[in-house]
């Protein structure tokens, strides 16, 4: 079990470091930097690369919503769910702390949102709580369908990380303006703890919505689409 939890810790670490790190350190440097497209691609690439690296050890979840969906779908034992969540959240917190230290090394540093998620005044585009709730539920549900479908016995072998990585990239392209894109409670928790905003007070949405979306996605796949 230790090797599985270690894989989830380091996999989540890499996801947050590559994804949130690109947003914090590179999105606006120099001037335009890598922008939304670059950040979206960074999140997708982190999942793709680490899924190939450690997916064979733990399943490559790196996300409490994914772990919940796999439990609902019967692919992850219920007894493993909470340990997976703990490893994922700790990995995200460790990464956020390191990113904070790195970012603070720049003159005139201000933590600001630190790539955290939010709605209302904390939404990049000023979107409401309801808009944030809906988009996070819908996109998480489809992310789960992509994951369950691409890793099923019906799909071509060996290509799942590519589909999942591109799926996460597309999700970010759609929703960065709305919530700064979560679909991952661990990712949201890590950076919220170090943000110099009210991100922590809005964190509930980025647990509730992805977990609800995960259950919906798993039910859709298991009940209507999948045969495995």
Curated annotation (Swiss-Prot):
Provide the site residues for: Involved in tetramerization or stability of the tetramer. Answer: 20
CDD domains per UniProt: MIP
Which molecular function terms from Gene Ontology are attached? water channel activity
Span of the annotated motif NPA 2: 184-186
Task: Indicate whether 4Fe-4S appears among the record's keywords.
Answer: no
Q: Where is this site: Selectivity filter?
A: 43, 172, 181, 187
Provide the topology term for how it sits in the membrane.
Answer: Multi-pass membrane protein
What does the UniProt entry say about where the protein is found?
A: Cell inner membrane
Q: Which UniProt keywords apply?
A: Cell inner membrane, Cell membrane, Membrane, Repeat, Transmembrane, Transmembrane helix, Transport
Q: Which reaction does it catalyse?
A: H2O(in) = H2O(out)
| PANTHER family membership | AQUAPORIN TRANSPORTER, MIP17260P
Say what the protein does.
Answer: Channel that permits osmotically driven movement of water in both directions. It is involved in the osmoregulation and in the maintenance of cell turgor during volume expansion in rapidly growing cells. It mediates rapid entry or exit of water in response to abrupt changes in osmolarity.
User: Quaternary structure?
Assistant: Homotetramer.
What's the entry's take on its domains?
A: Aquaporins contain two tandem repeats each containing three membrane-spanning domains and a pore-forming loop with the signature motif Asn-Pro-Ala (NPA).
The family classification in the record reads: Belongs to the MIP/aquaporin (TC 1.A.8) family.
Protein name from the UniProt record: Aquaporin Z
Name of the gene: aqpZ
């Amino acid at each position: 079990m230790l090797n599985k939890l270690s894989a989830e810790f380091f996999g989540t670490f890499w996801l947050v470091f590559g994804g949130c790190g690109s947003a914090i350190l590179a999105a606006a440097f120099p001037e335009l930097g890598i922008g939304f497209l670059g950040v979206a691609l960074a999140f997708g690439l982190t999942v793709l690369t680490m899924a190939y690296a450690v997916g064979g050890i733990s399943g490559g979840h790196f996300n409490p919503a994914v772990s919940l969906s796999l439990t609902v779908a019967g692919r992850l034992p219920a007894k493993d769910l909470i340990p997976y969540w703990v490893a994922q959240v700790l990995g995200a917190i460790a990464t956020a702390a390191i990113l904070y230290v790195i970012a603070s090394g720049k003159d005139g540093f201000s933590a600001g949102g630190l790539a955290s998620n939010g709605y209302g005044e904390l939404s990049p585009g000023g979107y409401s709580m309801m808009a944030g709730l809906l988009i996070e539920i819908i996109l998480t549900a489809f992310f789960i369908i992509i994951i369950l479908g691409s890793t099923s016995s019906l799909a071509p072998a060996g290509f799942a990380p590519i589909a999942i990585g591109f799926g996460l990239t597309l999700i970010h392209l759609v929703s960065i303006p709305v919530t700064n894109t979560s679909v991952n409670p661990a990712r949201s928790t890590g950076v919220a703890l170090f943000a110099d905003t009210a991100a922590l007070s809005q964190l509930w949405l980025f647990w509730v919505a992805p977990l609800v979306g995960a259950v919906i996605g798993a039910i859709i796949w298991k009940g209507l689409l999948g045969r495995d």
